[in-house]
Amino acid sequence: MEKIAIVTDSLSDIPEDLIKTYGIFVVPLTINIDGKSYKDGVDIKKEEFYKLLREGKMPTTTQASPVEFMEVFEDLLKSFDYVIAIILTSKFSGTYQSAVIARDMVDKNRIEVIDSRHFTLGNGMLVLKAARMAVEGASKEEIVSTVYETIPRIRGIMVFDSLDYLYRGGRLSRTQSIIGGILNVKPILTNEDGELKVIDKVRGQKKAIRWIIDYMKNTGIDFAEREVGLIHTDKEEFLNEIEAALRSELEITRFIRSQAGCGIGTHAGPDAAGVFFEEK
């Protein structure tokens, strides 16, 4: 049986217990605050980060470097036959390109680098699928093929309080960001081929939850048999309300719940929540 290591970046926001359970290797991005740099999920705790964010600090992110990936790849190839790295969308960060450079410098034949075209738990769910397959003994080719087949089937819905963080980070135009400043209006965003797009806006959290439920019902999926990802930045009460509605109206019982790390929090702000799932 092939020994396969699964690698991702810190913006996949996989819960720590699942990272340990499946032996996933995470390469952190760098968070910059007031002239100091921190490794996402390593040098700064989420609680401390979101406290700073609510105090008005405006952090930035720096992609993981080729050298950081090289060190991880070289170390893993000492004990694994292959490495599969599933990285957040290349349209959001240069981290994917860093991983590609590292692959080319270490061993192109034993390292596969995949542009997930997703972010946060959209990417995380792909990583978890790959990691579970690796544990079950699937081959490198089987895992890579399944991940590529799954990429277009992952759907994500994010509800933001403000789009200012995305605008300041260069991930959204000024025109798109304006609607987030209207009192109690919740912008709803989704992923379109690796980019965040504002697709609607509603007034208040209850209508945002209703929008999510209606969207998911319209897919025609029997969610009672599906695993659904739930993510929040620093808005757990809102996420609890979303989960309760999903359990009640769609009979969902299997969830991956996570708090977004500093990387996603930098661009989403402290008051965002989202739902991720795989279509048919």
From Swiss-Prot:
This is DegV domain-containing protein TTE1491. GO terms for molecular function: lipid binding. Residues 4-279 form the DegV domain. May bind long-chain fatty acids, such as palmitate, and may play a role in lipid transport or fatty acid metabolism. InterPro entries: DegV, DegV_C, DegV_domain_contain. Hexadecanoate binds at T61, S93. It comes from Caldanaerobacter subterraneus subsp. tengcongensis (strain DSM 15242 / JCM 11007 / NBRC 100824 / MB4). Keywords: Lipid-binding.
